[in-house]
Regions:
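Transmembrane alpha-helical segments of polytopic membrane transport and secretion proteins
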Residues: 1-29, 276-290
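C-terminal transmembrane helix and the adjacent membrane-cytosol boundary/short C-terminal tail
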Residues: 182, 260-290
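Transmembrane alpha-helix signature in integral membrane proteins
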Residues: 80-120
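Generic hydrophobic transmembrane alpha-helix motif, especially the helices
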Residues: 131-170, 179-180
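Loop-to-helix entry region at the N-terminal start of transmembrane alpha-helices
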Residues: 95, 99-103, 152-173, 213, ...
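Transmembrane alpha-helices
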Residues: 163, 167, 200-233, 260, ...
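N-terminal signal-anchor transmembrane alpha helix
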Residues: 18-46
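Short cytoplasmic-facing helical segments at TM-TM junctions of multi-pass membrane proteins
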Residues: 172, 176-218, 246
Length: 290
């Protein structure tokens, strides 16, 4: 005998929405956010047509146009006859994106040795004896408190910002990699040695191959902290970059520029996260992260 349907059944653990419902529901909160923003903007502009705190759609479009097609205030103006591609290449958004992306990718590349160190701490006992306690202690130091020291050591140029990002994320990534590698059953390592595997084979062909998808997932989760430290460095001492531009626009209440910049940063991080997720699924089809 069938029981009566109850709305709470939709939230059951074993109830799976169809593909159409999944796609529709996934966009619902975005649509709600846009509607709420539009209502708030309309209400504020009724009271003050020149309101800049919650810019209207037209103000946002003008801000996007100024960001994408016009150079920054500190740069020389473009020739009115310049082509569209030339305008984009010399635009404020392009200049800031290239500057921030360069710092971000260099810091991301410098995290590779941190991952390998975490692997070695877990696999090789002497590495663990030397580094584990120090990394545990260093991980508790607030990275932003080291910013004055970094400015003294590296100056206010690129490397102080890059090192802030690395120091802020690397210790946590080292410990995360170490914990993931320690979860590999000891029996597999013993069995590999009985098959005449070398230390290198065990570390990189047995342990690393198993934990690599989880490490990539940890890197994905570290993208936002990396961006946070990048923004902190650029807002304090920089002459270009996405965070630098947001800080400049904040002084002028330029929300028509700030909001598109925030959405652009979120989109870039989302695309990088999607790229890492795609690569992880292609390289390790048996691992299905969120």
């Amino acid at each position: 005998m069938k029981t009566a349907f109850h709305p709470t059944d939709l939230a059951g653990i074993q109830v799976r929405p169809s593909r159409l419902w999944t796609q529709s529901l996934s966009w619902m909160l975005f649509i709600v956010g846009v509607i709420l923003y539009a209502q708030l903007s309309i209400a504020r502009h009724k009271e003050n047509p020149e309101d800049r705190v919650v810019p209207s759609a037209r103000q946002l479009m003008d801000g996007v146009k100024a960001s994408v097609l016009e150079p920054a205030e500190e740069d020389d103006p473009l020739d009115p006859s310049a082509s569209l591609s030339e305008r984009i290449r010399h635009s404020m958004l392009w200049k800031d994106t290239v500057a921030s992306a360069r710092r971000f990718l260099i810091a991301l590349a410098l995290l590779v040795p941190a991952i390998l160190l975490g692997l070695h701490i877990a696999v090789f006992p002497y590495f663990g004896a030397v580094f584990q306690r120090f990394v545990l202690f260093f991980d508790k130091i607030v990275a932003l408190s080291l910013l004055p020291i970094l400015f003294i050591a590296f100056g206010i140029d690129e490397w102080s910002k890059i090192m802030l990002m690395v120091i802020g994320v690397a210790p946590t990534l080292i410990l995360d990699t170490c914990n993931i590698a320690l979860a590999v059953p000891r029996e597999q390592i013993v069995k590999a040695f009985t098959l005449k595997s070398t230390n290198f084979d065990v570390a990189y062909r047995v342990v690393l191959k198993q934990v690599l998808p989880q490490i990539i997932n940890s890197v994905r989760l570290s993208l936002k902290p990396l961006a946070l430290f990048l923004f902190a460095g650029e807002m304090i001492a920089s002459t270009d970059g996405l965070a630098y531009r947001i800080a400049i626009m904040r002084r002028h209440m330029g929300m028509d520029i700030i909001l598109p910049y925030l959405l652009w940063v979120a989109l870039l991080l989302f695309l990088l996260d999607a790229l890492l997720r795609f690569a992880n699924r292609r390289l390790h089809p048996w691992y299905q992260p969120l």
